[in-house]
Amino acid sequence: MERVLIVNADDFGLSKGQNYGIVEAYRNGVVTSTTALVNGEAIDHAAQLSRELPALGVGMHFVLTLGKPVSEMPGLTRDGLLGKWIWQMAEEDTLPLDEIAHELACQYQRFIDVFGREPTHLDSHHHVHMFPQIFPIVARFAAQRGIALRIDRQTVLNADDLPSDLRSTQGFSSEFYGEEITEACFLRILDASAHRGEASLEVMCHPAFVDNIIRQSAYCYPRLTELEVLTSASLKAGIAERVYRPGSFLDI
């Protein structure tokens, strides 16, 4: 059985080093798709690069934890900035859901304004769209617009509540991250997905060249390691041996 493999590079637009790393992993590696932070410092640079690569699927990386929001969000920001306190607010069930829904729509429109087209799909920075309070908002939004959504099915409390017309891959993995960034890890992800009988799989990654912005990230030099692995000839061969067809979210 032929299976669709989407290797999605998160954080397009975060920095020029991130952008160049993603483009390198697409041109000379196994990356097939990316998602962009519309409030990133290098988002215009990302859009410019994407126009030179029309086959690269570009989705939207919904941001609620970094930088300035596109709309006014007094209930979520501190000193006008987004941050990781969103986790505590989620635990306390004090998230400003109306503001979040409005910000999602505003970021979506900003994406269209910057890239000149709709995104191929939605996911989010730090997976905040998988919060139980936020997921229904994002799932409904994606279904209404007919675009796909990254779904980590291990964290969805009730898959029966998903909109019937919502598109996603059958499998998703965030395991290619952190301390174990190896070809062996990547190929194990594919083998496990095949064992589960999934016809489509998304593997998340963050390839980048290190620059001053990336140095400020808690996840810095592993991004460069990811780039090295994702552009290796042996990884390409291993994927081909497993009868996976490279694709984007337009293929599901």
From Swiss-Prot:
Keywords: Carbohydrate metabolism, Chitin degradation, Cytoplasm, Hydrolase, Magnesium, Metal-binding, Polysaccharide degradation. Pathway: Glycan degradation; chitin degradation. InterPro entries: COD_ChbG_bac, Glyco_hydro/deAcase_b/a-brl, YdjC-like. It catalyses: N,N'-diacetylchitobiose + H2O = N-acetyl-beta-D-glucosaminyl-(1->4)-D-glucosamine + acetate; diacetylchitobiose-6'-phosphate + H2O = N'-monoacetylchitobiose-6'-phosphate + acetate. It is found in: Cytoplasm. CDD domains: YdjC_EF3048_like (cd10803). Its EC number is 3.5.1.105. Its main location: cytoplasm. GO terms for cellular component: cytoplasm. Gene3D superfamilies: Glycoside hydrolase/deacetylase. Pfam families: YdjC (PF04794). Its cofactor is Mg(2+). Mg(2+) binds at H61, H125. NCBIfam families: PRK02134.1 (NF002559). Involved in the degradation of chitin. ChbG is essential for growth on the acetylated chitooligosaccharides chitobiose and chitotriose but is dispensable for growth on cellobiose and chitosan dimer, the deacetylated form of chitobiose. Deacetylation of chitobiose-6-P and chitotriose-6-P is necessary for both the activation of the chb promoter by the regulatory protein ChbR and the hydrolysis of phosphorylated beta-glucosides by the phospho-beta-glucosidase ChbF. Homodimer. PANTHER family: CARBOHYDRATE DEACETYLASE, YDJC DEACETYLASE FAMILY MEMBER. This is Chitooligosaccharide deacetylase. It comes from Salmonella typhi.
